[in-house]
Amino acid sequence: MQEVSVIIPNYNGMAYLEGVLSSLEQQEFQNFETILVDNGSSDGSVAFTMGNYPWVHIIELPDNFGFSRAVNEGIYAARAPYVLLLNNDTEVKEDFVEEM
């Protein structure tokens, strides 16, 4: 079981996803899951993530229900006892998850 669930709400943020997901991919601590909650994006965010980061669990909402709903959906799906919330335009250092 993962120790940490990282939740990333997203709406039309494909331009930012490479930064946040690549920085998570480089984490020294590996016992975490990543959940991208997509708020009905029309910019290819979901396809980009599926094609480049197959380890990311994606929750697709049919419309833009807003930040709070996306966060809540991610928390409901989280399988770890600890949750980290990241904006889609965040890039983290390689020890971020471990230090948290």
Residue map of PLM features:
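Cell-envelope/extracellular polymer assembly enzymes that use nucleotide-activated donors
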Residues: Q2-S5, E33
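Short, acidic, metal-binding catalytic loop of nucleotide-sugar glycosyltransferases
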Residues: S22-N31
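A conserved acidic beta->alpha catalytic loop
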Residues: S23, D38-A47, D63
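A short, amphipathic alpha-helix embedded in the catalytic core of nucleotide-handling enzymes
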Residues: L24, T49, G74, F96-M100
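Short beta-strand/loop segment that forms part of the nucleotide-sugar
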Residues: N31-G40, I59-L61
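Acidic donor-binding/catalytic loop of UDP-sugar-dependent glycosyltransferases
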Residues: G44, T90-M100
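Glycine-rich, basic loop-to-helix element that forms the pyrophosphate-binding segment
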Residues: L61-A78, N88
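Short aromatic/hydrophobic "clamp" motif used to bind/position activated sugar donors
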Residues: V83
